[in-house]
Amino acid sequence: MRQRSNTFFLLFAIVTAMSLVTAAVAMAATIIGDNGPNNLTGTDQRDRIFARGGDDTINALARADRVIAGQGNDTVNAGAGHDDVSGGDGNDALDGGRGHDRVLGGEGDDAMEGGGGFPGRRGDELHGNAGNDNIEGGGGYDLITGNAGLDTLNGGGGCDRIFAGPDNDTLNGGAGNNFRRLRCERLHGGAGNDTSTGGVGRDFMSGGFDNDTQSGGNGSDKIFANQGRDVSDGGNGRDVLWALSRKDVTAIGDLEGDELSGGEGNDRFLVRDGEKDLIHCGGGNDRVIADQYDQVDPDCERVEIRTITSLDQVQDDEENRTEAPSEDQDEGPTP
């Protein structure tokens, strides 16, 4: 009996020791670099990695990690999981990996990727900072914002919300195409001269505060020419092109306005903004509501000219609103 009891206690001690070792291995790590160039690798748990200064390479591996790259030209691969990545100052390359990640660029020219997302699900948040950033969304529903600098913002494969910054940015909707949603890609210009291209599906596009160029591409798009002299092209599909009244208008018929092209498809134009707009209908059976200051191409099938006699008539009419309606209007950066 004594020998059997000793054997039991010995086995209990071994199992307990193994459990403690396993628990220690499973614990998340806090990894801290120094001010030199570091090569830091996380564990398969929820790690916190602080690289500090220097040109660092960081591989966070799996799970939901928090990575702060610090100053320097850093390369971060966050790996699978719902990660929180901050680039810091310097020209960084930041990849969120698979999962819905939050990636923040710092000052510098950053290249940021959301990584492989989950189609039809919540995607990544990718936010640029000062510098000329190149931001690429993933496969989910991403939120992408530019900031100061000449940014290129690409939506990727999901239905995305993209907001330009205060400078001259390029926005691309990507391959998102979900016909169950009224508008898949939503592209919003900022305070600069932005160039926006819609995706393959139904897009919502709004120019910003300067002279913007917008192209809807394939799909039935809704395009708003906002403040400034914008050029809007609906492309293929049944598009709605809207010329909004500019806030700097002091007299009707006094400003050169927007240029709107419908492209192929049965398009609709709403252009009663009191400016001298150009309207090109293109193929299809199109409808135009314009004012007496607009130049409408003769190929437009159904044209209704509504006379405007005062600036108050322009600004008070719901059709001539001075900003685009959108469920996203409170989510983007304020110019």
Identify the role of each PLM range.
Residues 270-310:
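Leucine-rich solenoid repeat scaffolds
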Residues 312-335:
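Ser/Thr/Gly/Pro-rich low-complexity, disordered linker/stalk segments of secreted
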Residues 11-21:
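Bacterial N-terminal signal peptides
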Residues 2-12:
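Bacterial N-terminal signal peptides that target proteins for export
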Residues 33, 42, 51-53, 60, ...:
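Glycine-centered beta-turn/loop sites at beta-strand termini
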Residues 24-30:
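Sec/Tat signal peptide C-region and signal peptidase I cleavage site
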Residues 31-33, 311:
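Disulfide-bonded cysteine-rich modules in secreted/extracellular proteins
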Residues 37, 46, 55, 64, ...:
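Consensus positions within tandem repeat domains that build extended binding/scaffold surfaces
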